[in-house]
Amino acid sequence: MVKIRSIEYGLYPRSEHVRLSISKWERNALDHKSLGKLMDAEKKEILKLFNKSGINFYTDPLINWQDILRMVASLSLDTPFEKISRYRETNTFYRQPLVESYPRMGEIREEESTPDSHLPGSMYVSDNSDHYMYFLPGIESFVNMSFLSPELNRERVMDSFLEIYLDLIKKHGMKRILLFEPYPDSHFYEGNWDIFGSAQVFYVRYGLTEGSFSERKDSGPFSLIASNEKEFDVAARHSEVPGIALMNSQNTYLENPEKLRKSATKMSSSLKLDEIFVTHTEYFDFLPHVIANKKVEILGKVGD
């Protein structure tokens, strides 16, 4: 019998209460500290939902798009964010990290926040459970989504970020990590192997192919998360427990958990796997908050 476990990660839609509170904050009708407390409280409630719903592994419910890049930028850059930039060819805009010199380890500036940079609130809100994963952007994606000064060597910038990641993992005791790679290079960054060897890594890499993921016998991600069935074959060959995004987070349709289980069982059985992770496509922040909550409850029923 195939063991099926569930994963929830990344951006999560704000409740109506928090959304209205942010509008007040932007009009200076709510102070910075009060909004930060509201956002932290909301994250804690979402984490309780994940746990209650039976989600096996989950990250901090990021409720601000900028938080994908926020921790690394605030930790390592003199001027964390610069101009507004478009994410690929989408309607999503974000404040681009500005890399003016080679990154170095610094102190996390959690309280630094303006309407033009990011919202207030703690960098991470953890429930300290065995289900919790720290969320970090992949180094390839972080660099691709940043503005690099022309005089900098790109490979050296990536190696500098690698040193910061390894220090961060050690300093904060990050035993379990969701490494999010939405904007990867065409060639796999070899420094990732050091990250794989430093923690239990769940690696979400868009556009996964044999050519985009090199192989080493000594280490690898604990779980490589695939976006579709074709990518799942690659994930199964290159990780201990592969994952597949079966739940659609782009529409409000509420899936049948048994049908998702059957799909996961069929895919894993065809490759003679003993275990598989099931998660969602993209992230839930496109959905209304109440629909996202229902999808989480369904996803929890998919896992054992």
Question: What does each of the following model-derived ranges do?
Answer:
Residues 1-304:
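Domain-level signal for soluble alpha/beta catalytic cores
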